[in-house]
């Protein structure tokens, strides 16, 4: 090789490789950088962005740790908590290792929660986002329609997530989206519809792209106020989607698949009180085929590989929800009354009465606040005016049932006969 040819060979200023050893050499003022070094720099930057965008890579809690933290806010639903702990751990572990070059590509596993109203579906998803410190958004499937129809476009869900993290696209990519009432967009029959289904199958098709991973174009902050601004491009491939629904009568579909008791004279006669317990057992046997028969399209069911069920909360669980979690209702009202310098005491029979009423109303844990709020409305209205000298307010079952007023105990006053009976 002549000296002139040697002088013409260019080298990367970072790794020292020649132009013949790399695919491309980019020239700058008196320096050169090869494509391999550019890729390496991109990987370093991407790792830092993932670490900053929600801390998914920093100190990711293990499944048992996630389960323990869920226990602080959610009562019961042990199986669902175990499933979610593993699923979320694997999802963020996958995100934290995406920059490493590997022949195995791990797919995203979105989650479907099946359970009655007030069983804790939304709270579980919300608490997971809080534990992992990632952006979280809730969408109601019943408000969604196909693009071009009156209603909420499915891509508005991503906009809600962006709003939660101040339009930080990289942070939004590591977020969690919970879509509630997903069972309400099931088509009416398990055969493809010939007519236009604006809020059913069509919405499932639109959500399908979003859930499996697409680049959504979202208006920037301010929206139509700044039409000259470019749309934000959000890749949904790494956003974890959790869908939830009550799926009323799903147990009937499962029963038809599993029931071997026969029909007519051969059928087993069950007492009415066993129906609810039987339905709960059947729901635990849910398979993808049952959801397709219910009205979800096969492609949509396929994008929700992790299916877990939640049980209906009984009286004991509802009483624990009132007192045990970090943000328990009783603790919240105690704090509110503390602001006025007054103590509030909920007797056990009062908690029992609240739980019974929630079961009667079929609202589960979701209805507890409205029952307590309604019970204490008059008391909280008058409290600022009567708080002076008041030491304690006692709430018993009579107050919940509106049969008797709350018991007031003032400073330097002996407990009333009713309170002394404790």
From Swiss-Prot:
InterPro entries, per the entry: AAA+_ATPase, ATP-dep_Clp_protease_ClpX, ATPase_AAA_core, Clp_ATPase_C, Clp_protease_ATP-bd_su_ClpX, ClpX_bact, P-loop_NTPase, Znf_CppX_C4
One Pfam family matching this protein: ClpB_D2-small
Positions of ATP binding: 116-123
Family note: Belongs to the ClpX chaperone family.
Role this protein plays: ATP-dependent specificity component of the Clp protease. It directs the protease to specific substrates. Can perform chaperone functions in the absence of ClpP.
PANTHER family: ATP-DEPENDENT CLP PROTEASE ATP-BINDING SUBUNIT CLPX-LIKE, MITOCHONDRIAL (PTHR48102:SF7), ATP-DEPENDENT CLP PROTEASE ATP-BINDING SUBUNIT CLPX-LIKE, MITOCHONDRIAL-RELATED (PTHR48102)
Name listed for the protein in its UniProt record: ATP-dependent Clp protease ATP-binding subunit ClpX
Taxonomic source organism: Coxiella burnetii (strain RSA 331 / Henzerling II)
């Amino acid at each position: 090789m002549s000296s002139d040819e040697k002088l013409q060979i260019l080298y990367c200023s970072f790794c020292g490789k020649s132009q013949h050893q790399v695919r491309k050499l980019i020239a700058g003022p008196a320096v050169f950088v090869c494509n391999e070094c550019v890729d390496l720099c991109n990987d370093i930057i991407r790792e830092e962005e993932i670490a900053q965008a929600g801390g998914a890579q920093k100190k990711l809690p293990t499944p048992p740790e996630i389960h323990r933290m869920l226990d602080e806010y959610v009562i019961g639903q042990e199986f669902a908590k175990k499933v979610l702990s593993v699923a979320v751990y694997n999802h963020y572990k996958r995100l934290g290792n995406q920059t490493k070059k590997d022949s195995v590509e791990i797919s995203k596993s979105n989650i479907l929660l099946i359970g009655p109203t007030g069983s804790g579906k939304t709270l579980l998803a919300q608490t997971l986002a809080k534990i992992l410190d990632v952006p979280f958004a809730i969408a109601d499937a019943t408000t969604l329609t196909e693009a071009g129809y009156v209603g909420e476009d499915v891509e508005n869900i991503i906009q809600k997530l962006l709003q939660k993290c101040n339009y930080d696209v990289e942070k939004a990519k590591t977020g969690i989206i919970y879509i509630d009432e997903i069972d309400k967009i099931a088509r009416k029959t398990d055969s493809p519809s010939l007519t236009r289904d604006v809020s059913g199958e069509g919405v499932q098709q639109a959500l399908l792209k979003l859930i499996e991973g697409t680049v959504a174009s979202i208006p920037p902050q301010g929206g139509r106020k700044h039409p000259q601004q470019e749309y934000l491009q959000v890749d949904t491939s790494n956003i974890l989607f959790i869908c939830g629904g009550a799926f009323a009568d799903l147990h009937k579909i499962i029963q038809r698949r599993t029931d071997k008791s026969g029909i007519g004279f051969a059928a087993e006669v069950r007492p009415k009180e066993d129906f609810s317990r039987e339905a709960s057992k059947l729901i635990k046997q849910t398979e993808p085929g049952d959801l397709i028969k219910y009205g979800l399209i096969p492609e949509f069911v396929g994008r929700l590989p992790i299916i877990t069920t939640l049980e209906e909360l009984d009286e004991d669980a509802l009483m624990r929800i009132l007192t045990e979690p970090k943000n328990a209702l009783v603790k919240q009202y105690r704090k509110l009354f503390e602001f006025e310098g007054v103590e509030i005491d909920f007797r056990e029979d009062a908690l029992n009465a609240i739980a019974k009423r929630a079961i009667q109303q079929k609202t589960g844990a979701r209805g507890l606040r409205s029952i307590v709020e309604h019970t204490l409305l008059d008391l909280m209205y008058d409290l600022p005016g009567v708080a002076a000298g008041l030491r304690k307010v006692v709430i018993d079952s009579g107050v919940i049932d509106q049969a008797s007023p709350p018991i007031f105990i003032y400073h330097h006053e002996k407990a009333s006969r009713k309170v002394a009976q404790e």
